[in-house]
Amino acid sequence: MNILAFDTCFDACSAALLLGSTARIVSCFEPMATGHAERLVPMIGEVVLQSGLNFKDVDRIAVTFGPRTFTGKSIGVAAARALALALDKPLVAATSLSVMAEQMADEIEVSRDPAARHILIATDARREEVYCQLFRGRDALSAPAVLQPRA
């Protein structure tokens, strides 16, 4: 299965295409605080071109939908929805926090330490706030939350 995925929820813009037949990943990542709307579509085009596939070869579209600023997540979700409709492909979405927890869960499984299975993902929400969510492995134990750290 060939999966086209992208993220616009943080201070970077990224797109990747997983080529299911070879498990190869073609990706593009650019740090940026703003400008996601201008870079996302060209970035998606770049990864598809570099992969040697055509858009019709994509089997699924994946996108993150926050938490983050309204504009950041709206850009990614709108692009994902447009591509999914235009290509008649299924669309899957995940929170950025759950994607990060998934990556950590893979590392924890290697360690096999039961105490290490609880994962707290915390990211800068700006304005002196933090987005956070608690997981046990890949399972969410809480909803995403916005917290104000105390001094």
Residues covered by each model-derived region:
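Stable alpha-helical structural segments in soluble proteins, enriched in small hydrophobic residues
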Residues: V47-S51, A86, M104
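N-terminal beta-alpha supersecondary unit
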Residues: M1-F65
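DPxDG-like acidic metal-binding loop motif
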Residues: A62-S96
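Short, charge-rich binding segments
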Residues: L53, L85, S111-R112
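Glycine-rich nucleotide phosphate-binding loop and flanking beta-alpha elements
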Residues: A12, T69, R127-E129
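Surface "functional belts" at beta-alpha junctions
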Residues: A23, G35, P90-A151
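Buried hydrophobic packing segments
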Residues: I44, A79-L83, M100-M104
